[in-house]
């Protein structure tokens, strides 16, 4: 029974570490990804060694179950850490002057554009936001422009702009 619980525990650690390693690699944090990859491999070898030492159906099922539960935990951890930035586009039918001001008052940089849509003139706001602040931005948009169409893109790399100036001031 102790080995079964150990297999489960190792999987519940292994998969979230795997998730974080993948995220760090995608975000360009290769040193952290390398360290996490080493830890991940050690846990993987230990857990698999226990399963192969005593090939029982229960051990294999617990290994697979631990992997599935680990994915849930890894996803939860990733959402809580919210590493990185998103480029958010807010599309509106009317010029959102009040929303633009409120977004800026809340410390976000915003650039607005006018374009031609199928049914007439449309407006687009581009806002770069730390993922940890996405909920704040979403709530502002919902409050001031409830009919707005919102799209978020993962921003892996960027240079200059209002956000970096703001980050340098706050450090």
Curated annotation (Swiss-Prot):
| InterPro entries reported in the protein's UniProt record | DUF2179, DUF5698, UPF0316
Q: Which domain of life is it from?
A: Bacteria
Membrane topology designation: Multi-pass membrane protein
Task: Please give the coiled-coil regions recorded for this protein.
Answer: none
CDD domains documented for this protein? YitT_C_like_1
Main location per UniProt? membrane
Instruction: Recite the UniProt keywords alphabetically.
Output: Cell membrane, Membrane, Transmembrane, Transmembrane helix
Fetch the NCBIfam families from UniProt: PRK04164.1-5
Q: Which family does it belong to?
A: Belongs to the UPF0316 family.
For this entry, the protein name equals UPF0316 protein Exig_2248
Name the lineage.
Bacteria, Bacillati, Bacillota, Bacilli, Bacillales
């Amino acid at each position: 029974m102790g080995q079964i619980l150990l297999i489960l525990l190792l999987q519940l650690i292994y998969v979230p570490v795997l998730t974080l390693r993948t995220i760090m690699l995608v975000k360009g944090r290769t040193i952290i990804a390398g360290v996490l990859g080493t830890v991940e491999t050690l846990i993987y070898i230990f857990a698999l060694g226990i399963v192969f030492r005593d090939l029982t159906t229960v051990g294999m099922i617990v290994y697979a179950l631990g992997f599935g539960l680990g994915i849930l935990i890894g996803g939860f951890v990733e959402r809580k850490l919210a590493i990185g930035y998103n480029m958010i586009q807010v599309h509106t039918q009317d010029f959102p002057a009040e929303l633009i001001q409120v977004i800026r008052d809340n410390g976000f940089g915003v650039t607005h554009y006018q374009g031609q849509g199928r049914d007439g003139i449309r407006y687009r706001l581009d806002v770069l936001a730390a993922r940890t602040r996405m909920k704040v931005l979403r709530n502002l948009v919902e409050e001031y422009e409830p009919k707005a169409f919102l799209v978020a893109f993962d921003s892996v790399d960027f240079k200059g702009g209002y956000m970096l100036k703001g980050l340098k001031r706050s450090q």
